[in-house]
A protein has these predicted regions:
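The Walker A/P-loop phosphate-binding site
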Residues: 49-142, 149
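Phosphate-binding/switch region of NTP-binding enzymes
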Residues: 86-87, 92, 96-97, 190, ...
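DNA transaction DNA-binding modules
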Residues: 187, 307-316
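Short, small/acidic-rich helices and loops at N termini and domain boundaries
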Residues: 1-52
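Conserved inter-motif catalytic segment of the P-loop NTP-binding fold
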Residues: 6, 91, 117-205
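Amphipathic alpha-helical transducer elements in NTP-driven molecular machines
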Residues: 12, 72, 132, 136, ...
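Amphipathic, non-transmembrane alpha-helical secondary structure
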Residues: 100, 104, 108, 173-184, ...
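Short, conserved phosphate-binding/catalytic loop or strand-edge motifs used
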Residues: 19-24, 193-202, 236
Length: 316
C-alpha cells in the first residue's frame, strides 16, 4: 500500500542518517571496538516498519495442530538443549566443583551425578574466578576417572575451558567477540559459566536492572545462534546482621525471573558435607535433578534421589 511505501522510505532515511553520523565518528578518535558498539546501539534504536505478518504468528487452532517437538536432552533428565539454569549457593559451598563435574562428565557421555552412560556432548566451561590450582585439582581427579571409564573411547578435546580469573564483560564488544569465536570453534551443547557477577562490569550509577537486561539479551542471542544449554553459577546476597542468607540471586531481580530453572545448593545440617538441592522459584520446565549432592570417594559429588533416578523423587 501507499502507506507501507511511505513507511519504508522513512525507515530508510533514518538508517541513512545513522550511517552518515557513524561515518563521521569513524574519521574521529573513537576506538574501533567502541565505534562498533555505538553503531550497533544507534541501528538498534531505529524502529523498523513491519510490512507482512510475522512468520511465527498463527491462529491458536492452527498452532495447536502443528507438531511441537521437545528439544533433546543434553544431560538426561536434568537439562534439555537451549535451557537456562541458574544455580545459587553461598561462597565455598561447592557449586563450582559441581558445574565443573557437569561439564567434564557430560563431554564423555557419563551422567554427572548418577554416573550412568549417556550420549556425549561437547561442553564449554567458563571459569571467571577460581585459581588454576583449584581447577587442576578437581579436573585431574574427574578426568582420571573418566579416562579409566572410557578407555580408548575417551573423547579428547570434547570439553573446553576458558579460564579468565580477571573476569570479562559480556557487554564489551571485544570480549563478546572472543566468546563468539570460542563458541564457533567448540560448538558446545552445554555451557557452564560462573560466577555470573564476573561476567559483566557495572559502571557507577548504572541501574542493576538495566545491566542485567543487557547481559541476558546477549546470552539469549548467543543461545539462539549456537543452540547450547546454559548453566550459570551465581552467588547469594549476604545475610543481614549475621542472619541466615536467602538463597536468591544477588543483584537484579531479573535473575530470578529469567531462567527456566532456578536451583539452590544449601549445606545439609543433617548430612555434614552434603548439599540439599532446592529451588528459589517455580520452574517452567520439568526435570529431575538430585535431591541432594553427597561427597564421593572418587567423584567429588554423587547425586541422591530418594526413589532412584526413575522412582519417586524431586520432580521439578
Amino acid at each position: 500500500t501507499y502507506a507501507e511505501i511511505v513507511g519504508r522510505h522513512a525507515h530508510t532515511r533514518r538508517v541513512m542518517n545513522v550511517l552518515a553520523e557513524s561515518l563521521e565518528d569513524a574519521y574521529g578518535t573513537l576506538d574501533p571496538g567502541a565505534l562498533v558498539e555505538v553503531v550497533t546501539t544507534r541501528l538498534t534504536a531505529v524502529e523498523g516498519v513491519p510490512v507482512e505478518l510475522p512468520l511465527d504468528a498463527d491462529s491458536i487452532d492452527e498452532w495447536l495442530l502443528q507438531p511441537h517437538h521437545e528439544p533433546p536432552w543434553v544431560i538426561p533428565r536434568m537439562m534439555r538443549q537451549g535451557w537456562r539454569v541458574v544455580i545459587v549457593a553461598a561462597e565455598g559451598a561447592g557449586k563450582s566443583v559441581a558445574t565443573r563435574q557437569i561439564a567434564l562428565c557430560a563431554a564423555q557421555g557419563v551422567h554427572p551425578f548418577d554416573h550412568s552412560d549417556c550420549p556425549p556432548v561437547n561442553t564449554l566451561l567458563i571459569d571467571l574466578e577460581n585459581p588454576g590450582e583449584a581447577i587442576k585439582d578437581t579436573g585431574e581427579r574427574i578426568t582420571s576417572l573418566l579416562r579409566a571409564r572410557r578407555g580408548n573411547d575417551y573423547r579428547a578435546n570434547a570439553c573446553w575451558i576458558w579460564h579468565r580469573p580477571s573476569g570479562l564483560d559480556l557487554r564489551n564488544r571485544r570480549h563478546r567477540a572472543e566468546l563468539e569465536v570460542l563458541l564457533e570453534h567448540v560448538r558446545p551443547q552445554v555451557v557452564c559459566l560462573g560466577p555470573l557477577y564476573r561476567a559483566f562490569t557495572r559502571r557507577s550509577r548504572e541501574d542493576h536492572e538495566a545491566v542485567a537486561e543487557q547481559v541476558q539479551r546477549v546470552l539469549d542471542q548467543l543461545r539462539a545462534r549456537f543452540g547450547f544449554g546454559l548453566i550459570l553459577e551465581h552467588h547469594a546476597p549476604k545475610g543481614l546482621s549475621g542472619g541466615k542468607r536467602d538463597l536468591v540471586p544477588f543483584g537484579s531481580s531479573l535473575w530470578q525471573r529469567w531462567p527456566d530453572m532456578g536451583l539452590t545448593l544449601e549445606r545439609d545440617d543433617d548430612q555434614p558435607g552434603s548439599l540439599v538441592v532446592g529451588q528459589y522459584r517455580g520452574h517452567r520446565v520439568r526435570a529431575r535433578w538430585p535431591e541432594r549432592l553427597d561427597r564421593g570417594v572418587g567423584w567429588p559429588w554423587v547425586g541422591f534421589w530418594s526413589g532412584g533416578m526413575t522412582g519417586v523423587g524431586l520432580d521439578f
